């Protein structure tokens, strides 16, 4: 029997609770009038509060994954247009101290290509949230070179790591990434597990006719390593005209393949604002082999109604959604002498304009102008 895994997509809180336009107006009023201590939260018109900040540290990458970047011809941002270390840390401090951010995820491009990454993580780890806790710090990486730096990154304050791996077949890895580097990624997964950054999460984008055959082998591999595999529906973020809604491999199709090998049951822990729906898996041929797998169904079962993310690009702009067509620049204001409160106000305004959903299925949907490598995962 095939397990039915999802209910209908969750609407934004505003719609879910039947909030009126007047309620939204009061939310906006509160968002722009800080309390006595001068702090705000990043709230939008639908009552969603951003607690998770994705910080892209570079648009550069040492792979050329087919669904993310062209093989050649992509120009990198000039250094002077990107935030320097002090600017990155200042904006992170504003986000944490003044705007209620509690989790920071460093992304790219490939964040391990950022010089002084350990210093940026250490500076972030020194901050305390509005609850008096250490900021939770995570890293999303392709894994190349991570094994050689994992000890220093953990010492600096890194709590957790996500490693991208779409196949464990060597030939298919070369075809997907246009680089022969699989052994380096596998070494980094081993190093992250050994360093105790649990759970080490493995991100795999599933593409039609490309790596569907890797679904079960990836699951077996990740379970053997004690890491948590998360399958991701391919989204319209790569080279234009490559993605077609009708051709994508859906969450249901991924789970159907998993059920050929495993018994699946919903994880009991609450999902909250997490993007992945978690499933406990048991090997049908050996019940002693167990693990947990996540499915991120951003297209077929969007979780926009519970999204708690804000995004800072490497050139200092705020994106309130991965698929937003508009951005709010902070870099120039920062370099022109804006105060922390003024930058926080700009940031709050950007998040207020967040739409109820990503709109992938809307008529007239346009994918972002930036490639994924320049937005940050």
UniProtKB/Swiss-Prot annotation:
Its EC number is 4.1.99.22. GTP binds at residues 54, 105, 140, 201, 309-311. S-adenosyl-L-methionine binds at residues 67, 109, 164, 235. One of its GO terms (biological process) is Mo-molybdopterin cofactor biosynthetic process. Keywords: 4Fe-4S, GTP-binding, Iron, Iron-sulfur, Lyase, Metal-binding, Molybdenum cofactor biosynthesis, Nucleotide-binding, S-adenosyl-L-methionine. [4Fe-4S] cluster 1 binds at residues 61, 65, 68. The keyword Transmembrane helix does not apply. Residues 1-29 are annotated as: Disordered. [4Fe-4S] cluster 2 binds at residues 304, 307, 321. It catalyses: GTP + AH2 + S-adenosyl-L-methionine = (8S)-3',8-cyclo-7,8-dihydroguanosine 5'-triphosphate + 5'-deoxyadenosine + L-methionine + A + H(+). CDD domains: Radical_SAM, Twitch_MoaA. GO terms for molecular function: 4 iron, 4 sulfur cluster binding; cyclic pyranopterin monophosphate synthase activity; GTP 3',8'-cyclase activity; GTP binding; metal ion binding; S-adenosyl-L-methionine binding. PANTHER family: MOLYBDENUM COFACTOR BIOSYNTHESIS PROTEIN 1, MOLYBDOPTERIN COFACTOR SYNTHESIS PROTEIN A. Belongs to the radical SAM superfamily. MoaA family. Monomer and homodimer. Catalyzes the cyclization of GTP to (8S)-3',8-cyclo-7,8-dihydroguanosine 5'-triphosphate. This is GTP 3',8-cyclase. It comes from Corynebacterium glutamicum (strain ATCC 13032 / DSM 20300 / JCM 1318 / BCRC 11384 / CCUG 27702 / LMG 3730 / NBRC 12168 / NCIMB 10025 / NRRL B-2784 / 534). The lineage of its organism: Bacteria, Bacillati, Actinomycetota, Actinomycetes, Mycobacteriales. The gene is moaA.
